[in-house]
Amino acid sequence: MDICAVIVTFNRLECLKKALKKYEEQTKRPKYLLVVNNNSSDGTMEYLKIWEQEQSEIQKVVVNLPCNTGGAGGFHAGMEKALELDCDWIWVSDDDAYPEPDALKSMEVFYDSHPSLQERIAAMCGTIMDYDKEKILLGHHCRSKKVMGVAIMKEVPEEE
């Protein structure tokens, strides 16, 4: 199973660095790691030029957008590029989402262990946990902020 992981980023270079490291540490690494830079102004473009040249068994692809198209626009650009690549699955993620080391392997194991369902499986997703991993976020439309070093999750009002 060849996977292309698409990560959309905007002005969160430190989050992006942490996310990229998490994909390098996967027990089942993606074939492609595709980063969509949503016109960041915090040094992300310069960092990605260097990152793209670093040796890795993962093929690195960077898409630099001329303007910030938001999350949806970034994922659209990433999916378009990913569909041009030789991969079986596309994994999408924000720059502040950090997959567990076996996330991609778990997806592969699930798919491979259910051959009778494979023709009907069009999408799979992981579980979204809060920062402390104490509970599953079912409606993960949340906002977080740090108070004295502790991440506090707060639901975003529906009107937002």
Where are these regions (language model features)?
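Cell-envelope/extracellular polymer assembly enzymes that use nucleotide-activated donors
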Residues: 2-4, 32
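Short, acidic, metal-binding catalytic loop of nucleotide-sugar glycosyltransferases
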Residues: 21-30
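A conserved acidic beta->alpha catalytic loop
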Residues: 37-46, 67, 97
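Acidic helix N-cap motif at the loop->helix transition within catalytic regions
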Residues: 42-51, 102
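Glycine-rich, basic loop-to-helix element that forms the pyrophosphate-binding segment
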Residues: 65-82
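Short beta-strand-to-loop acidic/aromatic patch adjacent to the donor-nucleotide binding site
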Residues: 87-96
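Conserved donor NDP-sugar-binding/catalytic core segment of glycosyltransferases
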Residues: 102-138
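Short, flexible, basic/aromatic active-site loop/helix in glycosyltransferases
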Residues: 143-160
